[in-house]
Amino acid sequence: MKIYNTYSRQLEDFQPIEPGKVKMYVCGPTVYNYIHVGNARSVVAFDLVRKYLEFRGFEVEYISNFTDVDDKIIKAAASENISTKELSERYIAAFYEDTDLLNVKRASQNPKATEFIEAMIDFIQELLDKDYAYISEGDVYFRVAKSKDYAKLANKNLADLLAGASGRTDEETNLKESPADFALWKSVKADEVSWQAPWGAGRPGWHIECSVMSTSLLGETIDIHGGGADLEFPHHTNEIAQSEAKTGQKFVNYWMHNGFVNVDGEKMSKSLGNFTTVHELLQVVDPQILRFFLTTTHYRRPLNFTDDALTEAENNIKKIENAYRHLDDQAESNLSALTTFRNDFVAAMDEDFNIANGMTVFYDFVSWVNKGNGGAEVKAFFDQVLEILGIKFEIEQSLDSEIEAMIEERQLAREVRDFAKSDEIRDALKAQGIVLEDTKDGVRWHRE
């Protein structure tokens, strides 16, 4: 199995620290609003990675955090005249509601930043003791000049990174030894949530939170760290700098970053205002369709969010569901053909989780199933791929029985040449969204 490591910009053989086990950390949302489709792309992309690793036999310890203390949370809470805790808990609940509908497997743990404040203070104190950090008027900053290969993850020089970074780097430069230095701790401002530290009251900076939560729960070196491509700098760059300064160990063995969701060629983001929240979208779009849209493009490629793309996803799901519902798990099949499908799917996915190539194999498999191939092993592989994709087809047994009874009644009508009755039953089923297909092997049905 190979993973594209952002740090080296190369495909690398995957060798976990402990054979058979994977320690994985993915940056979660800052919970001041509902997640948008761009956020969901990251959640779904790494859910697919996790599920495929489990399919391949790995035991995955999967950690994804909630940033529940942040400038944006403080501002949003103040605008509603509520506490930051009340605001963040609201949007944590909404996150679970949305991602459950998208069939995202719950993380092994979802730590909150506010649960690790003491550990963050200890982490910062150690950086101060090692002279990697300094105090300036109650703030604590990291000395970037002491960090070896600081800009390597983003594959740019430091000047370019600072010029292209987001507003997260717009800190009080007059308090810093160098404009490149970043905040580990921000001193308290009036009426803001704060905690007491040896250097004064305040709250942690954004970057320190993920370093502390990941190393506290997974150890000093982890196998895989994931997130959106926009996190390469400054967030992940700064995580590496502070973590390796503290521990003296390599922080992450494989860095993975998913591509953006674009609207009219621009990255979907709250700051641009061109975002659609998942909460809103799921009022009008089936969660399965959104999940399929987000899942079936290779995770590193950008996605263009359009109505046509959602329609294509819907049509493809219908084809897959139709094959799945008519798969006869008692049928006989050529198991060597099944083995070929399985091996080809694994070969595609083993190349940096290339689901786009994997889907090409899977669509061929679906066509093969539609030719009458079935059996328990065929159904088992079908189920495994659906699990990786995060797609579930609910089998409505009572409705299926009713439909089968009507089909049988129609067949009897045809045998006695009562075509008016036959057409009446066909029309009644069509009104329920059920389409009949008369084939040489009998009648089949599927939902429109």
Curated annotation (Swiss-Prot):
Annotated cofactor note: Binds 1 zinc ion per subunit.
Keyword Cytoplasm appears in the UniProt entry: yes
Record keywords, A-Z: Aminoacyl-tRNA synthetase, ATP-binding, Cytoplasm, Ligase, Metal-binding, Nucleotide-binding, Protein biosynthesis, Zinc
UniProt subcellular location: Cytoplasm
GO MF, one example: ATP binding
UniProt-listed Pfam families: CysS_C, DALR_2, tRNA-synt_1e
Subunit structure, as described in the record: Monomer.
Family, similarity comment: Belongs to the class-I aminoacyl-tRNA synthetase family.
Protein name: Cysteine--tRNA ligase
Organism the protein comes from: Lactococcus lactis subsp. cremoris (strain MG1363)
Upper classification of the organism: Bacteria, Bacillati, Bacillota, Bacilli, Lactobacillales
